[in-house]
């Protein structure tokens, strides 16, 4: 419908009808709006189309407007909260809103605005204009109430314009029409802000316009606040109180209307407060808050004057809150003092309207504020005002007094009208009567803390006596707080603050030289400390008095100090530590001397005895040198006192102290105690038997402590002999005495065995205990034993074990453990069941170690029956962890895990609390952790397992280091008993690191174990650990060192027991295996199997000892028999299970089978594998080992099948790729084959097809078998085993792919093959990094139980997500090339990995050229490796010696040899490229493929194949994978030297693909020359049309552990390319996933954020001369000719974007790998030292070196050298590299800058020795760019 028709159709509507419609919500619609506009427009335009047209007047419009506004308010009130929010959003985007969905509110507002516009049009006079203004303000009010500010902005600006017009023409009747026209306004918040100010008018006009103006100004502020601008400008804020601003308009508009004025003031105040919260400028916020406070104060004063109901408290609270915000905002750097004074002054007169309490609050805040501004005089003025006002308020009075103290410290010239000490003293009494509230106490403590801090640093105020008096008074005041009403958190908070207050007081006290004069002043502080249970202050004060005593030369003052010190210690119960003994000793020294009278001496001794009684009564007395000193002096002094006085003195002491004296008296030579004194002490003890037992037990303790000290042992033996003589006459019928007799006899024999290693001594010990049990087993349970006596027995028990265990006498250990098990079984009281659990568990574990699982289970079961009686958790835990480990080792893994979940971590205190000595407790705890670590290790939790062992080693290290500083009596007796457990802990740590592939760490811990074991006098103990070290060194590539250890032990092992012969043979077998002496390895492993049988027979005799009449005879027979009796089937019916021993034999048989397989004895290997399976435990490790062996047997069988066919036998020497044939082509042929159609391919012989199928099935079985165990192997197996599994998977996958015929479906794909090739490369690295993080994060393990450990699992990579997570996360322009050599060193595996593509994998046999040309020299891997090592070794040697040559002739010779080595290295790299890579070197070429040209080349390639293979039209030409065809492109344009040979390599590769996949043809019929020419023509066509583009590609080399030492970056095919390297794809992904990596591709380095270290060793003068000026000029933080500390080094790495190091090595001498592992961020690092980038090979283990440490620390880019370099050449390289990178010169903008990888590549050529020095620098990680 046209506009005209709309208009004509609506003329019948009258203004009254419109007004009616606008009054009702249901009439509001788009139609009404259109009608309204049409109707009003008719009137305005005066188009009288119809006589009935409506007649609109200004009054009609005004009424319609009011109706619409009223309706608008109603409509809005009825909307829900959700609809209101939706409507607000509609107003933000009205143009994009469908009109059909607009609410009525929207149309009403449109009507209002339109009517308002028309009112403006028809306005003729000021009255009309006034109504327009009122209407504009009204609609703005509604909009702002609705929080819709967008349309309100323009309305307010129009209203402001109208206001200006109205005020201008206020005295005129008419207004010029041109003035009222509405020009286009610049609608913005900034323009709106200027509308706040309206010109002031005369007072006579306020009646009509004032209210409107004020409302308008408030609406402007509301709109500005809703629009969320940054705040008001400073100019606007300063003018708010101007004549045109809202302040003055409010004051003049409502001179007598208080309520109206206050309501506007309140709104304005709230708006200003809101603006203060969104301001970005502190000054502006400050001014706004001041204005807001002024408004509130005006409201307060006017309301009080009006005297109406008003909530004064609420208003004052608001004012105080705002004032607090003002104080918080005020900072001298933001708000100047002059501005502060000026703005604060305007509030002074208003503050008088506040209540007294509020004024006190503000005065206190003002004093603090001006104090903050260092205006101490003005601050003091406010303090004085506040003090005067707070006369009756003691709380505020105290605050002002304390603040005056703080001001006095700053400025002692300030005079206060009061005496601070007197005023505080008067307050003290008031607070005693009226308790100090908690909140006031906190404020008081905070205030005094700040004051005391100032006092400590003040140079103006130094009156310490004054400060101490204040502390005393405040202490009494603080003591008035009622503690009982405080909650726990409040009390703790108060105690903490009081502790700080007391420490400040103590700091003051320390300044006094004569402290005893101020005892009264100290009482308040000591009382406060006692009231709040703080022991630190009295302890420090007591110790300080002791120190004053020691330092004082005045004897009397010293006595006063020590007396007060002891008094404080006693009154505060500080009598249980060593310092208390020192005070007793000092007091005794000062007061006792020979010149004293007898009574005076007795008094001093009596006082000392009383003081010692307090010590003995509050602590468990241990060894103490101070106590020894006191006792010596006491015993010396007793010699001058007669017997009667001695008896009186001894009668007054406690029984505990008496026993202590008696023990010391028995050590007469040590304490100078006479025999007479010992006799007196013994008489004072109760009865003879107790004296004897006590003395005997003391002798046992001395024997235990004196072990390993020859002189002391002699003394102990004499004491023991004397006790034995006494015992022999009393022990015939007394079980308790007989037990002590056996104990002393055993000690004597054990000490003698220690000296001579005489086995008869051990037999005597066992026999004596056997006799004792047989005689007293029935009566001993009725005897009562003290903890001291039981500990004496246990000390001997553990001492015996710790002595015999290192000797290797396993049968002695077993016999002794069983005897003591029977002994404690006889002593079975409830309190002794825990010892049975310990002994039984140790016995079970010993049987388990030997392999006799049945015997172990028997004693575990017996122990379990006692667990119900034993309620002590550490002993239950001890059994739980040992039994859990047993279950795991015997194949019951699930049960073992359930058992371990019952375990909770024990501590030394747990064992100590059960009455065990510290030595025994430590041993049990450390032993328990070894068991737990071993169990977790068996389950695959290597990181946590290592954590527990490192805890052990940390404890042991602390004890060893402590004991080395102590005398004999302090610690040595502990450390020798920890030798065995320490050695075993080190072995456990070594085994875990060995499992993780970290040979260097493993070697360290093995050597630690050897070092510890050598301190023991038993050769077998040391030999055990040396053989383990031998095994490690052999497998780590250090064969010579391993052989030497083995040779040194050869003679010793001939005369040892069977068990150690077994260990020696095992080590010998590993040495032979490493040397590839298969016969020798098999011989020694077979000998191990025989020795296991002998062990089984020997221990069978021991197990049946109960049939012997004497246990000793059975043991003698066992230890002395020369020809063992072998166990047969007939005599084992009653014998025990030995599955663990048999499992060991099974492992040996598997090893023998492996070597028989290498010898080619397939059938023998199969038979041995079958035998091993029969006796193997079904544990995880056995399953993995069995699967690996089974897979290798299948592979060997497959290899023999290959050699049976003339076609397939060439497969091992042929290049194999995955993929080969296009997947699409394979799929199409598979469909054709399924439909039964003729594929056109000729079948080969049936035999060949049969062999191919058989091979594929075998290879598939290998792959599937290994894939099944992969996940568990990755999580739990060693790194070596995991690599072995993955190599089998990769080999079988690629070989199976090569044999897949065309059209055959297969589940083999390159992504899964690449996954198994790449994943194990990072396993060792990640395990080591996790272990380091675990050790750094868990210095102490805090697991409450093993539940959370055992429920957690290692994150295992998933082959299904490999493509997404690893490959497709790479940058699209990257070319990742992975290089791996197999274990035999015969095949090179190269993978090309790109985003969006499946990996391309090649197996390149290094001898493939020899199969085509027998005369061609083969470059095998070992030969190339040896040549590289020779060149580098010679270069390293020459680099070190070159600086010593001074003669010209020597230098020339040196340079000649260096150049020759450079040429040798160049030739080696060229040979590697030609011989190893050949035609496949294009895999490194980052050539960007032109898709259209490539499609054309692919088509030509198909035609060439069809032509040269003479295929008929029915036979489809096999389509190769695009990745294969790209190899021809990446070889480059034909024509360069050697191209034909490279192309020939690819041609033969293609022929092999077709042949092995079932396309049969005769090699002789194919003209390879013609094929080569055709391909060159096609390639020339490609390159002639190819347009090169800028290539920003980057190549990342993923180098396996055996190939990393080669400088691949310097191969000719990689020359001048951007190349970096990483050890694994996983490490690359970790780097790319870091947050600072840009676009997942590179890192950016800020040029100014760097650090450096230059010449820290002071011997690189040339380097310093070259770089010093440039580094200093760069302005970076660094060190020149100065050695950094570890902290400096770490800070430079973590606190900057890049780090330069010009020194020796890689900085290893300044930091450690563990420190690097703690870094959360590591800079881009450039290490230009020799061999800083070298990774050192470790045989079958993982390499180690500086680069791995930096990569582990998160370093994204590391530049380092692979070998030693000469400084001048590498300095030249470094300078060129850093200039090219852009660090030393201004470069172009970032888009044209050079990455560090390109800079390194381009800088190699500047070296004189291009390869020897230029090839050494490499980059680990990803590219890095300098940000300009």
Curated annotation (Swiss-Prot):
Keywords: Cell cycle, Cell division, Chromosome partition, Cytoplasm, Hydrolase, Nucleus, Protease, Thiol protease. One of its GO terms (cellular component) is cytosol. Residues 1647-1741 form the Peptidase C50 domain. It comes from Schizosaccharomyces pombe (strain 972 / ATCC 24843). Interacts with cut2. Interacts with rad21. It catalyses: All bonds known to be hydrolyzed by this endopeptidase have arginine in P1 and an acidic residue in P4. P6 is often occupied by an acidic residue or by a hydroxy-amino-acid residue, the phosphorylation of which enhances cleavage. It is inactivated via its interaction with cut2, which probably covers its active site. Cut2 degradation at anaphase, liberates it and triggers rad21 cleavage. The active site is at residue 1730. PANTHER family: EXTRA SPINDLE POLES 1-RELATED (PTHR12792), SEPARIN (PTHR12792:SF0). Pfam families: Peptidase_C50. Its main location: cytoplasm. Transmembrane segments: none annotated. It is an enzyme of class 3 (hydrolase). One of its GO terms (molecular function) is endopeptidase activity. GO terms for biological process: cell division; DNA damage response; meiotic chromosome separation; meiotic nuclear division; mitotic sister chromatid separation; proteolysis. Its EC number is 3.4.22.49. The keyword Cell wall biogenesis/degradation does not apply. It is found in: Cytoplasm; Nucleus. This is Separin. Caspase-like protease, which plays a central role in the chromosome segregation by cleaving the rad21 subunit of the cohesin complex at the onset of anaphase. During most of the cell cycle, it is inactivated by securin/cut2 protein. It is also required for pointed nuclear formation. It comes from the Eukaryota.
């Amino acid at each position: 419908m046209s506009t005209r028709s709309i208009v004509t159709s609506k003329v019948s509507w009258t203004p009254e009808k419109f007004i009616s419609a606008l009054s009702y919500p249901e009439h509001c619609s788009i139609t009404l709006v259109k009608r309204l506009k049409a109707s009003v427009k008719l009137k305005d335009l005066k188009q009288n189309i119809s006589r009935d047209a409506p007649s609109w007047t200004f009054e009609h419009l005004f009424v319609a407007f009011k109706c619409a506004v009223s309706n608008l308010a109603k409509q809005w009130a009825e909307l829900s909260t959700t609809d209101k929010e939706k409507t607000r959003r509609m107003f933000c985007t009205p143009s994009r809103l469908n009109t059909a969905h607009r609410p009525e509110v929207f149309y009403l507002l449109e009507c209002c605005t339109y009517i308002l516009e028309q009112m403006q049009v028809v306005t003729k006079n000021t009255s009309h204009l006034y109504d327009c203004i009122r209407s504009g303000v009204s609609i703005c009010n509604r909009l702002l109430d609705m929080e819709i500010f967008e349309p309100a902005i323009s309305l307010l600006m129009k209203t402001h314009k109208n206001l200006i017009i109205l005020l201008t023409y206020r005295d005129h009747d008419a207004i010029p029409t041109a003035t009222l026209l509405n020009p286009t306004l610049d609608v913005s918040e900034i323009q709106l802000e200027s509308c706040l100010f309206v010109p002031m008018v005369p007072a006579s006009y306020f009646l009509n316009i004032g209210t409107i103006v004020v409302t308008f100004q408030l609406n402007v502020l509301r709109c500005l606040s809703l629009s969320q601008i940054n705040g008001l400008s400073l100019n606007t804020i300063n003018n708010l109180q101007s004549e045109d601003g809202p302040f003055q308009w409010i004051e003049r508009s409502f001179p007598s209307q208080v309520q109206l004025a206050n309501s506007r003031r309140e709104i304005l105040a709230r708006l200003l407060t809101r603006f203060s919260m969104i301001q970005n400028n502190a000054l502006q916020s400050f001014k706004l808050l001041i204005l807001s406070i002024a408004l509130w104060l005006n409201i307060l004063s006017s309301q009080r004057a009006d005297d109406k109901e008003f909530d004064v408290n609420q208003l004052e609270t608001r004012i105080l809150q705002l004032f607090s915000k003002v104080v918080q905002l005020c900072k001298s750097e933001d708000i100047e003092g002059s501005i502060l004074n000026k703005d604060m002054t305007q509030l002074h007169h208003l503050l008088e309207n506040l209540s007294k309490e509020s004024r006190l609050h503000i005065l206190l805040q003002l004093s603090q504020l001006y104090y903050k501004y260092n205006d101490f005089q003005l601050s003091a003025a406010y303090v004085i005002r506040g003090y005067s006002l707070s006369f009756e308020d003691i709380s505020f009075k105290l605050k002002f007094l304390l603040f005056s103290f703080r001001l006095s410290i700053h400025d002692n010239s300030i005079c206060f009208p009061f005496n601070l000490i007197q005023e505080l003293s008067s307050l003290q009494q008031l607070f005693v009567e009226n308790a100090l509230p908690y909140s006031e106490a906190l404020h008081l403590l905070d205030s005094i803390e700040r004051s005391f801090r100032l006092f400590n640093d003040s140079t103006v105020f130094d009156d310490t006596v004054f400060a101490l008096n204040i502390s005393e008074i405040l202490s009494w005041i603080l003591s008035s707080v009622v503690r009982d009403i405080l909650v726990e958190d409040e009390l703790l908070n108060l105690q903490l603050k009081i502790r700080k207050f007391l420490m400040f007081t103590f700091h003051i006290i320390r300044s006094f030289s004569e402290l005893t004069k101020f005892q009264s002043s100290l009482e308040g502080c000591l009382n406060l400390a006692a009231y709040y249970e703080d022991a630190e202050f009295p302890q420090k004060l007591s110790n300080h008095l002791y120190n004053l005593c020691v330092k004082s030369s005045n004897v009397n003052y010293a006595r006063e100090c020590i007396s007060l010190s002891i008094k404080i210690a006693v009154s505060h119960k500080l009598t249980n530590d060593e310092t208390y003994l020192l005070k007793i000793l000092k007091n005794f020294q000062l007061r006792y001397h020979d010149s004293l009278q007898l009574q005076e001496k007795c008094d001093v001794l009596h006082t000392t005895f009383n003081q010692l009684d307090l010590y003995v009564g509050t602590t468990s007395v241990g060894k103490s040198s101070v106590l020894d000193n006191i006792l010596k002096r006491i015993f010396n002094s007793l010699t001058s006192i007669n017997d009667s006085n001695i008896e009186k003195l001894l009668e007054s002491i406690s029984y505990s102290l008496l026993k202590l004296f008696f023990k010391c008296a028995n050590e007469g030579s040590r304490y100078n105690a006479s025999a007479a004194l010992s006799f007196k002490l013994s008489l004072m003890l109760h009865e003879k038997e107790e004296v004897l037992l006590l003395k005997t037990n003391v002798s046992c303790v001395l024997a235990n402590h004196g072990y390993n000290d020859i002189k002391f042992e002699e003394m102990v033996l004499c004491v023991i002999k004397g006790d034995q003589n006494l015992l022999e006459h009393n022990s015939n019928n007394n079980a308790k005495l007989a037990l002590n007799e056996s104990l002393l006899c055993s000690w004597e024999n054990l000490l003698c065995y220690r000296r001579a290693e005489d086995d008869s001594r051990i037999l005597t010990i066992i026999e004596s205990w056997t006799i004792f049990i047989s005689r007293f087993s029935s009566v001993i349970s009725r005897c009562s034993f003290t903890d001291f006596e039981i500990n004496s027995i246990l000390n001997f028990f553990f001492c015996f074990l710790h002595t015999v265990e290192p000797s290797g006498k396993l049968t002695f250990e077993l016999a002794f453990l069983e005897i003591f098990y029977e002994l404690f079984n006889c002593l079975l009281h409830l309190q002794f069941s825990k010892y049975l659990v310990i002994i039984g568990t140790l016995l079970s574990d010993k049987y388990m170690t030997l392999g006799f699982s049945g015997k172990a289970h028997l004693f575990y079961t017996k122990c379990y029956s006692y667990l119900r009686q034993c309620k002590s958790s550490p002993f239950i835990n001890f059994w739980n962890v040992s039994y859990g480990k047993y279950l795991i080792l015997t194949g019951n893994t699930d049960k073992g895990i359930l058992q371990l979940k019952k375990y909770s971590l024990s501590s030394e205190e747990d064992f100590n609390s059960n009455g065990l000595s510290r030595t025994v407790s430590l041993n049990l705890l450390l032993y328990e952790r070894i068991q737990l670590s071993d169990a977790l290790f068996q389950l695959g939790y290597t990181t946590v397992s290592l954590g527990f062992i490192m805890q052990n080693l940390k404890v042991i290290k602390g004890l060893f280091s402590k004991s080395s500083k102590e005398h004999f009596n302090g610690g040595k007796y502990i450390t020798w008993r920890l030798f065995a457990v320490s050695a075993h802990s080190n072995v456990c740590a070594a085994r875990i690191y060995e499992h993780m592939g970290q040979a260097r760490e493993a070697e360290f811990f093995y050597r630690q174990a050897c070092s510890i074991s050598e301190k023991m006098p038993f050769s077998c103990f040391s030999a055990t650990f040396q053989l383990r070290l031998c095994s490690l060194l052999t497998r780590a590539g250090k064969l010579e060192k391993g052989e030497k250890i083995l040779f040194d032990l050869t003679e010793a092992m001939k005369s040892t027991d069977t068990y150690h012969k077994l260990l020696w043979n095992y080590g010998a077998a590993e040495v032979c295996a490493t040397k590839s002496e298969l016969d020798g390895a098999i011989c020694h492993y077979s000998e191990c199997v025989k020795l296991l049988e002998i062990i089984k027979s020997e221990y069978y005799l021991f197990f049946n000892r109960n049939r012997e009449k004497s246990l000793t005879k059975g043991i003698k027979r066992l230890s002395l028999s020369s020809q063992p009796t072998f166990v047969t089937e007939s005599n084992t019916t009653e014998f025990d299970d030995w599955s663990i021993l048999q499992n060991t034999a099974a492992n040996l048989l598997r090893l023998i089978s492996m070597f028989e397989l290498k010898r080619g004895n397939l059938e023998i290997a199969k038979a041995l594998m079958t035998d091993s399976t029969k006796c193997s435990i079904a544990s995880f490790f056995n399953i993995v080992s069995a699967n690996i062996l089974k897979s290798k047997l299948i592979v060997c069988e497959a290899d023999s099948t290959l050699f049976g066919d003339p076609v397939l036998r060439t497969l091992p020497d042929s290049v194999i790729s995955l993929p080969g044939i296009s997947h699409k082509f394979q799929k199409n042929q598979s469909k054709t084959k399924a439909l039964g159609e003729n594929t056109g391919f000729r079948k080969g012989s049936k035999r060949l097809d049969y062999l191919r199928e058989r091979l594929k099935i075998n290879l598939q079985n290998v792959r599937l078998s290994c894939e099944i165990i992969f996940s568990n192997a990755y999580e739990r197996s060693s790194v070596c085993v995991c690599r072995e599994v993955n190599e089998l998977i990769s080999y079988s996958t690629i070989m199976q792919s090569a044999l897949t015929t065309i059209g055959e479906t297969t589940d083999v794909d390159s992504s899964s093959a690449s996954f198994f090739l790449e994943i194990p490369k990072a396993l060792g690295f990640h395990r080591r990094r996790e272990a380091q993080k675990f050790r750094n994060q868990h210095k102490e393990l805090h697991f409450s139980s093993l539940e959370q450990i055992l429920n957690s699992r290692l994150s295992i990579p998933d082959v299904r997500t490999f493509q997404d997570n690893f490959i497709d996360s790479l940058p699209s322009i990257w070319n990742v090339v992975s290089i791996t050599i197999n274990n035999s060193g015969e095949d090179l595996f190269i993978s090309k990995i790109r985003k969006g593509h499946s990996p391309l994998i090649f197996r390149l046999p290094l001898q493939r050229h020899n199969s085509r040309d027998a005369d061609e020299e083969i470059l095998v891997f070992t030969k190339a490796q040896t040549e590289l090592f020779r060149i580098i070794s010679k270069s390293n040697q020459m680099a070190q010696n070159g600086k010593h040559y001074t003669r010209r002739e020597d230098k020339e010779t040196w340079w000649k040899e260096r150049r020759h080595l450079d040429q040798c290295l160049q030739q080696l790299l060229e040979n590697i490229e030609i011989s190893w890579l050949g035609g496949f070197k294009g895999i490194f070429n980052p050539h960007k493929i032109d898709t259209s040209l490539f499609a054309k080349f692919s088509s030509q390639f198909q035609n060439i194949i069809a032509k040269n293979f003479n295929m008929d039209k029915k036979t489809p030409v096999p389509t190769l994978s695009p990745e294969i065809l790209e190899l021809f492109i990446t070889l480059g344009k034909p024509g360069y030297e050697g191209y034909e040979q490279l192309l020939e390599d690819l041609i033969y590769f293609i022929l092999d693909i077709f042949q092995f996949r079932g396309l049969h043809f005769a090699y002789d019929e194919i003209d390879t020359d013609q094929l080569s020419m055709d391909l060159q023509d096609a390639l020339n066509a490609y390159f002639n049309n190819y347009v090169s583009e800028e290539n920003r590609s980057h190549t990342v080399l993923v180098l396996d552990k055996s190939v990393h030492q080669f400088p691949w970056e310097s191969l000719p095919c990689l020359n001048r390319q951007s190349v970096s390297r990483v050890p694994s794809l996983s490490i690359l992904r970790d780097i790319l996933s870091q947050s600072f990596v840009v676009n997942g591709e590179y890192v950016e380095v800020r040029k100014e954020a760097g650090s450096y270290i230059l010449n820290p060793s002071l011997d690189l003068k040339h380097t310093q001369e070259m770089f010093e000026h440039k580094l200093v000029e760069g302005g970076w933080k660094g060190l020149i000719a100065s050695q950094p500390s570890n902290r400096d080094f770490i800070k430079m790495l973590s606190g900057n974007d890049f780090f330069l190091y010009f020194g020796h090595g890689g900085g290893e001498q300044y930091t450690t790998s563990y420190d690097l592992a703690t870094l959360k961020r590591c800079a881009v690092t450039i290490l230009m030292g020799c061999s800083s980038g070298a990774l050192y090979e470790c045989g079958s283990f993982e390499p180690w070196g500086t680069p791995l440490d930096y990569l582990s620390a998160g370093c994204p880019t590391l530049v380092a050298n692979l070998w030693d370099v000469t400084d001048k050449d590498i300095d030249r390289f470094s300078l060129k590299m850093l200039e090219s990178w852009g660090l030393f010169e201004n470069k172009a903008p970032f888009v044209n800058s050079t990455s560090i990888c390109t800079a390194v590549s381009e800088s190699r050529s500047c070296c004189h020795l291009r390869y020897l020095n230029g090839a050494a620098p490499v980059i680990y990680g990803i590219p890095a760019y300098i940000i300009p």
